[in-house]
Design a protein with these regions (language model features):
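Solvent-exposed, charged helical/coil patches
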Residues: 1-28, 72
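Residues at secondary-structure transition points
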Residues: 8, 12, 16, 41, ...
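A short acidic/basic microdomain associated with nuclease active sites
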Residues: 26-40
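Positively charged, solvent-exposed patches that mediate nucleic-acid binding
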Residues: 37, 49-50, 71, 87, ...
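Short acidic/glycine-enriched loop/turn segments that link adjacent beta-strands
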Residues: 40-42, 109
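Conserved catalytic cores of phosphodiester-cleaving nucleases, focusing on short active-site segments
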Residues: 44-65, 70, 82
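Short, charged, amphipathic alpha-helix that recurs within catalytic cores of restriction-modification
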Residues: 73-93
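Domain-level recognition of nuclease-like catalytic cores that cleave nucleotide substrates
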Residues: 92-119
């Protein structure tokens, strides 16, 4: 079944935002471990190694703040799911290093706001 034009636009917009954040994090010295890491609990947009920490990154891309700040869309339920996603990742790797949960906001003008330890 084909995607509606609106869903396709959102998917393309989100993918572009994730690429932009991945490039930003690489410039900061991070190593991208996984993109769009899927589990039964949901998907982590990016998982990155930042020195001795693993960051699970939720990327929010918006063309406006009409519906609030992008980070406001990371609800308590989404935060719980991200923690379950992290558990799946640790089981897969057989280790549990220092972890944090970050949120990246990407705006249509290319601006990125990055929040370490967002939740």
């Amino acid at each position: 079944m084909p995607h509606s034009p609106q869903k396709l636009y959102k998917k393309l917009l989100g993918g572009a935002g994730e690429k932009r954040v991945a490039a930003y994090l690489k410039k900061q010295g991070c190593k991208i471990l996984k993109r769009n890491y899927r589990t039964p609990f949901g998907e982590a947009d990016l998982i990155v190694q930042d020195k001795d920490e693993i960051a699970f990154v939720e990327v929010k891309t918006r063309t406006s703040d009409k519906f609030g700040e992008p980070r406001e869309a990371v609800t308590p339920e989404k935060q719980r799911r991200y923690k379950k996603i992290a558990e799946c990742f640790w089981k897969e790797r057989g280790e549990e290093p220092n972890a944090r949960f970050d949120v990246a906001e990407v705006y249509s003008d290319g601006t990125i706001e990055y929040f370490k330890n967002a939740f």
